[in-house]
């Protein structure tokens, strides 16, 4: 709950800064942070390799919220790319050594699936696309 309050407080500050209409060093820092985050994403798998599969959903959610707050549409292709590529991601191997993949963001852990569901809800709200 404290994390939720912290996020909402941060979001209010960001919205206030953006609505002031004058250049803000905070907005510049947001942009720099987003660009750095995007540079860590693996273009082959669609996920942020240093974060792993389910935490990539959290990074994607942050990316989507960044776009919603700033109006930066440059990240919209990233959302689509993650949707196409991360939906079939190797999450491990079974006891026989056979690779295990998630399919359509479903794996053996409900919480992992929940993080992806939250990301796709945010993507749908931002883009208006029902596929997410």
Question: Could you describe each region identified by the protein language model?
Answer:
Residues 1-4, 15-24:
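Bacterial Sec-dependent signal peptides at the C-terminal "C-region" and cleavage site
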Residues 57, 107-120, 132:
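Mobile, glycine-rich extracellular loop/lid and propeptide segments
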Residues 20-103, 126, 130-131:
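Low-complexity, Ser/Thr/Pro/Gly-enriched N-terminal "stalk/linker" regions
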Residues 101, 118-123:
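Hydrophobic/aromatic-rich effector regions of fungal transcription factors
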Residues 4-5, 111:
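Residue-level micro-sites within transmembrane alpha helices that shape
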Residues 7-12:
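Sec-dependent signal peptide hydrophobic core
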Residues 13-18, 40, 120:
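Generic marker of "main functional regions" within proteins
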């Amino acid at each position: 709950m404290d994390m939720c309050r912290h996020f909402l407080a941060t979001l209010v500050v960001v919205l206030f800064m953006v609505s002031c209409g004058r250049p803000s060093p905070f907005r510049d820092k947001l942009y720099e942070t987003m660009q750095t985050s995007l540079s860590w994403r693996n273009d082959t798998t669609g996920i942020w390799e240093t974060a792993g599969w389910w935490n990539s959903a959290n990074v994607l959610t942050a990316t989507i919220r960044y776009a919603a707050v700033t109006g930066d549409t440059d990240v919209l292709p990233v959302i689509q790319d993650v949707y196409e590529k991360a939906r079939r991601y190797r999450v491990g191997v079974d006891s026989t050594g056979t690779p295990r993949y998630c399919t359509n963001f479903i794996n053996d852990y409900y919480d992992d699936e929940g993080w992806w569901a939250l990301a796709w809800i945010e993507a749908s709200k931002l883009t208006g696309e029902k596929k997410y």
